[in-house]
């Protein structure tokens, strides 16, 4: 199945000059969504890890589904003020601004192996912040899996030395 045909391009969103890759048509189609999750799981079948870590909002959708299918725990990473317990955070640059990512301070035990999952790999800034959060808590990132990669932004330069997997490349 060509999953790319389920990704909608939204020009000038969230600001002028940005082409937003909207995955909601893929999520709405049960066959495409199932295919995407199955194929993302296949990308990491040979990796040994304990937890799937994913950021809100669309990362939750993919990450939680993958964690369920792979029989792993799921750790949500959220924006400021959204998690109820004590957190640690990292600040990072987006394609269109600055943001913070927070994780519960006890979400990852020292030495646990982690798969990071998100919907889009754009500049690599979010992924870098997620890696720093995992390391801050004593975890080890074994791989990163993304539904979409915007290769023209060269995000892999920021993730050198990490195993990066993507399904759909622009």
UniProtKB/Swiss-Prot annotation:
Molecular function GO labels: adenine binding; adenine phosphoribosyltransferase activity; AMP binding
The reaction(s) this protein catalyses: AMP + diphosphate = 5-phospho-alpha-D-ribose 1-diphosphate + adenine
Segment forming the signal sequence: none
Subcellular location(s) per record: Cytoplasm
GO BP term (any one): AMP salvage
UniProt GO cellular component terms: cytoplasm
Cross-referenced InterPro entries: Ade_phspho_trans, PRibTrfase_dom, PRTase-like, UPRTase/APRTase
Keywords linked to the UniProt accession: Cytoplasm, Glycosyltransferase, Purine salvage, Transferase
Pathway: Purine metabolism; AMP biosynthesis via salvage pathway; AMP from adenine: step 1/1
SUPFAM superfamilies: PRTase-like (SSF53271)
Record-listed E.C. numbers: 2.4.2.7
One Pfam match: Pribosyltran
Assembly and interaction partners: Homodimer.
Family label: Belongs to the purine/pyrimidine phosphoribosyltransferase family.
UniProt function note: Catalyzes a salvage reaction resulting in the formation of AMP, that is energically less costly than de novo synthesis.
Protein name: Adenine phosphoribosyltransferase
